[in-house]
Amino acid sequence: MAMHVFPLNIYRAMHKRDGAYALLEQMNGSLDKNAENIILQKGQQAPDGTYIVIVGESANRDHMKAFTPHYAENTTPWFSEMVGTEDVALGYKAYSNFPTTIMSLSYALTSANQYGDTSLKNAISLMDALRAAGYETDWISFQSRSSLASAAVTMIAERSDRTYWEQDPDEKMLDVIQKLPPAKKRVIFVHMNGSHYSYTSRVPEHRWNDFGISTQDPDHDYDVTLAYNDWIFKNVFEYAREHMHLQAMIYFSDHGENMVHYHGTSPFFFDMVHIPFFVYLSPEYRALYPELMVQLKKHAQIVFTNDLIFDTVAGLFQAKTNFYNPEYDFSSPQYSLTKEQALTFHGKEKISDDLGFHING
């Protein structure tokens, strides 16, 4: 495997021993080494086509009408429409594993999680598992490549076959996708700016009034970002389905958002880890693997934490390896996480302590 090159300040950050930067030290060299030990399970063959994984930013499902039907503002008209089809399942009890991006995605995009092996020294990246299964991988990011806050995510992202680091509004993801080189079977990852504060900077000014969010809404600016995201998802989905042989599309957020304290470790509130989780499987894909959507819909009201994205995507996309565990795969009949077992804040908080657990669905 070719050596991956990162900005110098990321490597300097590895010398820091505290907080998120300890993750960099754990991953440095380990991802390459562990990738050499990947063994793909036999009998898996996903069909050719395009598979999309969209990683949102600071999206709180409590503000998304598809997940919280009694919410006053229709922030998710496309999601809400799709929920009524046979092709889509939602995770109404989805949580982030940590209320910051770098800590959350370092687990979501690797085989490490809060329940089994928590050490990134022993982990592989999702990109490496997918490549072992015959996929080409693309990473499109609208966040910084070289900031220290995104260092671990950059290290994982750069394991993709191609990376694209954009400075435009999120809606430009469709332009980037349209210009990708042809690929027989590919997974496209998109990392959005999403709903990160400051909210007014996430939506182009000329689109601010396009989504019907009431000016009387106390969380107007935040809710506009969610409606803007929903519109983007619709555009990407329709293009990929029409022109790219779309087989599957997954969306989840890195973490949620509190309307007073935003997100972070102190103070901590559970809405900081309330996230959306959306899965689309094409009719063609469902015909090949009918049990997947059955299980996803069966688990819709069961707790899920996004450090299990690795196992779930591997299961959905037929990329199961010796690092895969069906008990952590939301699409598997063996999925076994319960509310009492579920954790966040990397094991320091119990989901069962969340007084808002029953707010969605």
Language-model regions: role of each:
Residues 1-210, 305-306, 311-336:
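Active-site-proximal alpha/beta segments of enzymes that process anionic O-linked groups
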Residues 32-42, 175, 211-249, 279-281, ...:
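A long, amphipathic alpha-helix that forms part
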Residues 54-59, 250-256:
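DG-centered beta-turn motif at the end of beta-strands
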Residues 107, 210-218, 289-295:
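Short glycine/proline-rich turn/loop motifs
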Residues 175-176, 262-266:
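Alpha-helical scaffolding within the catalytic cores
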Residues 194, 253-261:
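Acidic helix/loop microenvironments that form the catalytic cleft of cell-wall polysaccharide enzymes
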Residues 271-279:
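Substrate-binding/active-site groove segments that recognize
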